[in-house]
Amino acid sequence: MSSPEKFSPAPESNSNPSLPDALIISCIARVSRLYYPILSFVSKSFRSLLASPELYKERSLLNRTEGCLYVCLYLNPFESPSWFTLCLKPDQALSSETSNKKKSSGYVLATVSIPHPRLVQRSSLVAVGSNIYNIGRSISPYSSVSIFDCRSHTWREAPSLPVELVEVSAGVLDGKIYVAGSCKDGDSLNLKNTFEVFDTKTQVWDHVPIPYNETKHNIYSKSLCIDEKWYVGAKRKVVSYNPKKGIWDLVESEMCSYKSSYDYCEIENVLYSVEKTWRGTVFRWYDTELGRWRKLEGLNMPYSGTGDRGGKKMIWCAVITLERRKNSGIWGNVEWFAHVLTVPKTFVFQKFLAATV
């Protein structure tokens, strides 16, 4: 079985491109980000241009920004995490626009080369624009915050949390990162809840007051943002916070039914969840108006599980388009479904995120 997908770089060219950098940037800015990992092997000068701020300014001016998938894995539990990004295979890049072949064979997770990798944990990784924020590190307690720039693939430091947290979970709403966590309660061995908010524009932390006694007796370690509210959960209880009104509310317990794991995400202000059953993989979405989970119609996904492939595991990826229909909920359609990466069987999945670049 093959090892994680890697592309072999082409021999370096001895001559520099005769075209000026500004013209090359203007051309590359019009190309989908799916091609960038392949273009990076053209030459060192190309690699430099692909990470330049000028390129992404041009992409923004041309309205060519797009969502890019990033995946974080621990291939070895004793090593730093590895990052991957979804791209086109080299043998598909030039022909994908005109070929009649199915798209399912044209995508792969390519390794992202990072000079100084950081320790991460899934609940504390969030994407805001072209940046991925790592709230704290894997060593507890922690308060450090770092930013992964998805344009240059480099880390930089951000202002630390005002308190040291033992547990942490983060969500994004209107460009602000809302963090739920627990910290030591004075000199006692008990833990107390603390909620903080980080403005990514001003790079300033602020405290979110906790008015309910309910939140003072439960350690809230999972959070997300939908419907212009920040939802924070612990076990079978969920509270929501409306930042514009400064109001906390208790939420129906139904929301916790299929959100007990990390197999959930928010897409265009709707919460989706995935559950593995003996009948197959079931997708659901949460109807905030009715206060209950509803099945995502139109999908017939096979049961997903794990199996030994010569000491390796295969990671598969699916792209599902979503359509909201009148009086019939939300429907899904599988665009493509394919094997995108082979990893050691000891790997540990952390998180996948979509950054806008």
UniProtKB/Swiss-Prot annotation:
Pfam family, any one: Kelch_FKB95
Entry keywords, A to Z: Kelch repeat, Repeat
Residue ranges of Kelch repeats: 131-175, 177-224, 226-267, 268-313
Domain of life: Eukaryota
InterPro entries according to UniProt: F-box/kelch-repeat_ARATH, F-box_dom, Kelch-typ_b-propeller
Matches recorded under CDD domains: F-box_AtAFR-like
Gene3D superfamilies: Kelch-type beta propeller
Protein name (Swiss-Prot/TrEMBL): Putative F-box/kelch-repeat protein At5g38680
